[in-house]
From Swiss-Prot:
GO terms for biological process: mitochondrial electron transport, ubiquinol to cytochrome c. It comes from Pomatostomus ruficeps (Chestnut-crowned babbler). GO terms for molecular function: metal ion binding; ubiquinol-cytochrome-c reductase activity. Heme 1 (or BL or b562) is low-potential and absorbs at about 562 nm, and heme 2 (or BH or b566) is high-potential and absorbs at about 566 nm. Heme b b562 binds at residues 51, 150. It is found in: Mitochondrion inner membrane. Component of the ubiquinol-cytochrome c reductase complex (complex III or cytochrome b-c1 complex) that is part of the mitochondrial respiratory chain. The b-c1 complex mediates electron transfer from ubiquinol to cytochrome c. Contributes to the generation of a proton gradient across the mitochondrial membrane that is then used for ATP synthesis. This is Cytochrome b. The gene is MT-CYB. Belongs to the cytochrome b family. Gene3D superfamilies: Cytochrome Bc1 Complex, Chain C.
Length: 308
């Protein structure tokens, strides 16, 4: 999945650059510029659909990558793991600020609700929110800075990816048995390159199918309506890949408690290398750990479903 994530990153940067060439980061023009792209720009509809659905595949790959790392004990490469968690946080931030850019109803209200969570921080909360917004509500300055961040963060992500790979190169990658694989090493090409092409094709086919046949399947219909600060949508919710965290946030009545639980649901990954007590690295021969692992997976799927 690491290779697939790299491919996702390249696809997102290339399609994103092409979209940025036609996009206008202004509240009065943003929605119209996206509509113009889909109607008048050569293959603009396809580029936009690939970019929007590419984000979903990016998250599918990163969640599978993290799940596999948990299952096979890859978190014992502490530096690689911690940079991986920082990469996840960067990806989440990038996806969030990018969701605001088309300036539809859910873009606007999603930005308002999520940035407003900073106000739960004692003493500095309200100041922080107003500083983030560039005013007293989500408006033109917010859109401008969010687009700037959305343009910048993928390159930060690419830099962190190189650091991630550098630390991985120190130890070598892990495998299902969780034992050193020095004696089993084989040439990268043609063995791994062939294996990777299979994964690439298996990801590309569903992505292209989704982008061509049902590009709006995972999007929110509210985003076909231009942002209107005077009309609140009946259900404010983020994209599907944030729903598990959003369910945790919404399930706690206290605002600060919800924000802390939301943050903890992702930041708990930093603790995992310190919680490993088994003499075996991988879960291959640990049935009780396997039960806990699959319970976690079921939990995340149920949270996503409930939140939807």
């Amino acid at each position: 999945f690491g290779l697939l994530l790299g491919i996702c990153l390249i696809v997102q940067i290339v399609t994103g650059l092409l979209l940025a060439a036609h996009y206008t980061a202004d509240t009065s023009l943003a929605f119209a510029s996206v509509a113009h792209m889909c109607r008048n720009v050569q293959f603009g509809w396809l580029i936009r659909n690939l970019h929007a659905n590419g984000a979903s595949f990016f998250f599918i790959c990163i969640y599978l990558h993290i799940g596999r790392g948990l299952y096979y004990g890859s978190y014992l490469n502490k530096e690689t793991w911690n940079i991986g968690v920082i990469l996840l946080l960067t990806l989440m931030a990038t996806a969030f600020v990018g969701y605001v850019x088309p300036w539809g109803q859910m873009s606007y209200w999603g930005a308002t609700v999520i940035t407003n969570l900073f106000s739960a921080i004692p003493y500095i909360g309200q100041t922080l929110v107003e500083w983030d917004w560039g005013g007293f509500s989500v408006d033109n300055p917010t859109l401008t800075r969010f687009f700037a961040l959305h343009f910048l963060l993928p390159f930060v992500f690419a830099g962190l990816t190189l650091v991630h790979l550098t630390f991985l190169h120190e130890t070598g990658s892990n495998k299902p048995l969780g034992i050193p694989s020095d004696c089993d090493k084989i040439p990268f090409h043609p063995y791994y390159s062939t294996k990777d092409v299979l994964g690439f094709v298996l990801m590309l086919i569903p992505l292209i199918t989704l982008a061509l046949f049902s590009p709006n399947l995972l999007g929110d219909p509210e985003n076909f309506t231009p942002a209107n600060p005077l009309a609140t949508p009946p259900h404010i919710k983020p994209e599907w890949y944030f729903l598990f965290a959003y369910a945790i946030l919404r399930s706690i009545p206290n605002k600060l408690g919800g924000v802390l639980a939301l943050a903890a649901s992702v930041l708990v990954l930093f603790l995992i290398p310190f919680l490993h007590t088994s003499k075996l690295r991988s879960m291959t021969f640990r049935p009780l750990s396997q039960i806990l692992f699959w319970t976690l997976v079921a939990n995340l799927l149920m949270l996503t479903w409930v939140s939807n």
